[in-house]
């Protein structure tokens, strides 16, 4: 049998399996799925388990079961496999090393010996995702200074960025500009223990998996300028981005995996899959009432124009 034409639109789920999914994860997954499917697109499931100790495989397996239960089916990746293996970031170190060495050969990578406490003590500005804008403390170290510091501590490695504005149009949030040096700062490519950093890993993986659109939470909006810079340096095609508003608890707190009541494990005991999908669709402006819906039934009317731009407080009693 001949394979059908490959869709030009490829979206992705890219969860970090450090615990059970919560409503915020589910909302982002639903929007990513609807955005790709509304264009007849495909979905890739990639497991972002860079920190393998915090992300046991049992959570990844449970995550797949949860997504399937909700009706958010994917076309390749995870345990299903496919043409772009591996789909688990913990298995991709060799792939990341190739790109890392390219950046190193450009003279843009340098060792950093700063501790987290030192960075916070420096009173440097913070990015919108809570990270400290690196003040460049180790950028100009001499070879002798580096050798001396290595005797006491293994370094992490950062990418040197220019004083340059990066502007892009976000599918949900509209036009956004960040200055690489002032708003982001030189950022980590590799931790001191050898684990590659999120920014490099997602760029390499999205490119090699043919991802054309990235839908994720607004807390990652500030990562986009850094990633676009990496795409350019590595000569890789950049996807389009859409950052969806975060789902907050009714008291305004950001939902996390510590919010047990809003974990899918507990929600599945109280609601059907259609109940959960329909209520999330209502919260995100995709329907006028919290009626039960399947993901499939929401595709034809999906539009980013309906999705709010500001974070969403979960209406009292919705879940």
Which positions does each model-derived feature cover?
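Noncatalytic linker/hinge segments flanking ATPase motor cores
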Residues: 22, 85-90, 151-153, 199-204, ...
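N-terminal Rossmann-like or analogous alpha/beta NTP/dinucleotide-binding catalytic cores
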Residues: 2-123, 127, 218-219, 223-236
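Active-site cores that bind ATP or allylic diphosphates and position pyrophosphate for catalysis
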Residues: 117-256, 263-267, 316-319
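Sparse recognition of residues in long alpha-helices and their boundaries
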Residues: 48, 79, 243, 267-268
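Non-catalytic terminal extensions that flank enzyme cores
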Residues: 1-20, 38, 43, 147-148, ...
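Active-site neighborhoods of enzyme catalytic cores
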Residues: 58-60, 64, 68-176, 183, ...
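Alpha-helix boundary recognition
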Residues: 101-105, 207, 268, 281
